């Protein structure tokens, strides 16, 4: 939040001081420190001198700070604290005043929030990220004109050229300048959509490998004898440059007294939201904590939760009732699930899921809604959801009447399995978002859905785009401008639920080929401008459970295949049957143009063509589609 405090530590310190820093949980301002577990590799060995913090809030730029920020790279924070990045500092200047820099708080997430496995020993999906000591930092600000963003590396590692810093998505092509040996300056032009991008210093890059053990292999950072999967920063740094709201947008997305009655929680412990009498809950800048054994189950009168820029809320919200016609969750604040254990079970005192429970019904979700038979709408805008302990967003009830408008949403620190992206319901739109997810990211289960401008950082589990798991009726889906900047999908065996595009086999029995329904149809889905930066495991696997027509994938570009054998990277197009042996159909693509179309699908810059000698399973295209479906797909290069 806006304020003054202590900022950068000195460019160089004595070795003794550096050792002291990495051995403690450094707090700003100074307060009692706690000794953490072993510090991650790359924890600052050379620190920067403290100076006064300066933030700004004018018509063109808004940054904020948390005076209770703590350096805690390996252990949980206290309820009253916000974890500050141990690896990066961020400052922002208006482009016409480049020397007038303002501080933007750099948040940080670590696997399991440093808690370890509490109350369970089974796998939770965070094993590799925890063992490899990965972290994710991010910084947000609002802007209305071009800015310069300075990102400084706190580790003592140095660069000698701005070319040693990569911005992803690389298509942004931002101007970069070297400021000094650990700082790069990035020109971010104003856009009504904003920008969400990764800043990647070369000394921070590492490669994840498959150790080739067992059926699937396991991820490791050891190169010897292993196969490369993907290269990414060990300690990532995301920048969220968000448009400053004005006019009608501000009126729609920022509550005032005219919007309804407002409850303003006080910073600190917040465990009384189940009984508020107002219509709107407004979190002002500050730190709020619900604790590990509570989440807000909101009364029927609450229609809007607003998280102001600089609000940091440790908790989750459940809109229990289905009586409101218009819901809103908006604001550039943070909603963090860091205090919950993985699969926190509300039927088991918020401990890890008990054997008697079903996580879909009883586990904490960061945002949960109930839908009625009457038409309902949700505006979900601006919020950063951090460290979800399970699904980040669900709606239970009538899925055909709940319509969503999602804008400038971000999801970070998704270390656990089942930390999906967002399922969009019938008639919904989503644009200008960032997802770090460890399960299905874009879930295309409903008709009349439009998605545009999505940046994705994909962890191991699940595919990027999913429309399977059960037979469905889907019509009219349009997804454009999707960039996968990183992914760690690594399996050496052929999984049913992976790749960039996927329609998985049935969730009840993924090995079954007899759970399809020819009375359902998936049709008229268009995916345009999908870019995968770096290496990945496979392009598309469709195990059709419904009749399928007119699936058009245009301008799908993969940087490279990972280091596994082609047999691990093969794409599939299969048709399954119902229990009576009736097989679903796929539309005829050659010549009718009603099947699966791959227009300008490329790998490493080479376009894959069905007649070009590069499309087969063992060739560059890796298209191992069933022979019976030969007429149901095509791959070709179209004119620019």
UniProtKB/Swiss-Prot annotation:
Read off the InterPro entries from this record. Answer: B_solenoid_dext, Dextranase_N-ter, Glyco_hydro_49_C, Glyco_hydro_49_N_dom, IPU_b_solenoid, Pectin_lyas_fold, Pectin_lyase_fold/virulence
Which stretch is the leader sequence?
Answer: 1-32
The segment annotated Disordered runs over 248-269
Q: Which reaction does it catalyse?
A: Endohydrolysis of (1->6)-alpha-D-glucosidic linkages in dextran
Any idea which GO molecular function terms this record carries?
Answer: dextranase activity
Q: Name one GO cellular component term.
A: extracellular region
What is known about this protein's pH dependence? Optimum pH is 7.0.
Q: Does the keyword DNA damage apply?
A: no
E.C. code:
3.2.1.11
Q: Which residues form the propeptide?
A: 33-49
What is the relationship between temperature and activity? Answer: Optimum temperature is 42 degrees Celsius.
Q: Where in the cell is it found?
A: Secreted
Keywords carried by this UniProt record: Glycosidase, Hydrolase, Secreted, Signal
Q: Which family does it belong to?
A: Belongs to the glycosyl hydrolase 49 family.
What does this gene product do? Efficiently decomposes water-insoluble glucan as well as dextran.
Q: What is the name attached to this protein's record?
A: Dextranase
- The protein's organism comes out as Arthrobacter sp. (strain CB-8)
Lineage of source species:
Bacteria, Bacillati, Actinomycetota, Actinomycetes, Micrococcales
């Amino acid at each position: 939040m806006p304020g003054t405090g202590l900022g950068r530590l000195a460019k160089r310190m004595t070795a003794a001081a550096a050792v002291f820093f990495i051995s403690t949980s450094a707090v700003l301002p100074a307060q009692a420190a706690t000794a953490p577990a072993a510090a991650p590799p790359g924890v600052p060995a050379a620190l920067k001198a403290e100076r006064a913090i300066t933030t700004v809030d004018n018509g063109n730029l808004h940054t904020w700070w948390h005076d209770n920020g703590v350096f805690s790279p390996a252990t949980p924070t206290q309820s009253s604290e916000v974890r500050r990045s141990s690896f990066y500092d961020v400052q922002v200047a208006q482009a016409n005043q480049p020397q007038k820099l303002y501080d933007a708080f750099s948040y940080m997430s670590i696997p399991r929030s440093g808690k370890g496995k509490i109350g369970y020993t089974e796998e939770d999906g965070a094993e590799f990220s925890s063992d490899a000591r990965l972290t994710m930092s991010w910084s947000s600000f609002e802007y209305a004109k071009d800015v310069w963003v300075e990102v400084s590396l706190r580790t003592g590692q140095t660069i000698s050229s701005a070319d040693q810093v990569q911005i992803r998505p690389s298509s942004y092509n931002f101007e970069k300048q070297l400021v000094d040996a650990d700082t790069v300056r990035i020109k971010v032009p104003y856009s009504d959509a904003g920008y969400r991008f990764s800043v990647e210093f070369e000394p921070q890059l590492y490669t994840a490998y498959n150790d080739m053990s067992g059926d699937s292999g396991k991820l490791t950072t050891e190169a010897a004898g292993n196969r490369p999967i993907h290269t990414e920063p060990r300690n990532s740094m995301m920048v969220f440059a968000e448009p400053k709201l004005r006019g009608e947008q501000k009126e729609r997305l920022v509550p005032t007294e005219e919007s309804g009655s407002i409850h303003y929680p006080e910073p600190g412990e917040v465990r009384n939201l189940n009984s508020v009498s107002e219509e709107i809950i407004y979190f002002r800048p500050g730190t709020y904590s619900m604790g590990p054994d509570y989440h807000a189950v909101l009364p029927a009168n609450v229609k809007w939760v607003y998280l102001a820029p600089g609000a940091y809320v440790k908790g989750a919200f459940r809109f229990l009732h289905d009586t409101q016609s218009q819901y809103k969750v908006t604001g550039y604040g943070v909603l963090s699930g860091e205090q919950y254990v993985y699969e926190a079970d509300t039927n088991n005192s918020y401990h890890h899921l008990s054997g008697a429970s079903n996580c879909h019904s009883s586990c904490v979700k960061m945002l949960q809604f109930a839908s009625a038979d009457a038409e309902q709408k949700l505006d979900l805008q601006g919020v950063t959801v951090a460290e979800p302990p399970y699904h980040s967003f669900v709606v239970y009830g009538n899925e055909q009447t709940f319509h969503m408008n999602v804008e400038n949403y971000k999801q970070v620190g998704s270390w656990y399995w089942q930390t999906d992206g967002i399922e969009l319901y019938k008639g919904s739109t989503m644009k200008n978002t960032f997802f770090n997810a460890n399960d299905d990211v874009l879930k295309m289960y409903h008709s009349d859905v439009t998605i545009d401008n999505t940046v994705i950082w994909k962890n191991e589990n699940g595919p990027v785009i999913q429309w399977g798991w059960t037979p469905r009726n889907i019509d009219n889906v349009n997804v454009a401008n999707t960039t996968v900047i990183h992914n760690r999908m690594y399996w050496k065996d052929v999984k049913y639920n992976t790749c960039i595009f996927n329609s998985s086999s049935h969730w009840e029995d993924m090995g079954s080929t007899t759970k399809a329904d020819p009375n359902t149809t998936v049709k008229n889905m268009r995916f345009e401008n999908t870019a995968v930066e770096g290496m990945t495991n496979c392009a598309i696997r469709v195990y059709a459970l419904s009749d399928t027509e007119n699936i058009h994938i245009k301008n799908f570009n993969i940087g490279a295949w990972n280091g596994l054998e082609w047999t691990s990277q093969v794409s599939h197009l299969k048709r399954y049957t119902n229990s009576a042996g009736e097989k679903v159909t796929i539309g005829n693509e050659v010549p009718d143009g009603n099947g699966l179309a791959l227009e300008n699908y490329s790998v490493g810059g080479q376009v894959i063509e069905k007649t070009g000698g590069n499309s087969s399973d063992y060739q560059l295209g890796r298209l191992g589609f069933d022979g019976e479906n030969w007429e149901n797909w095509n791959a070709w290069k179209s004119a620019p």
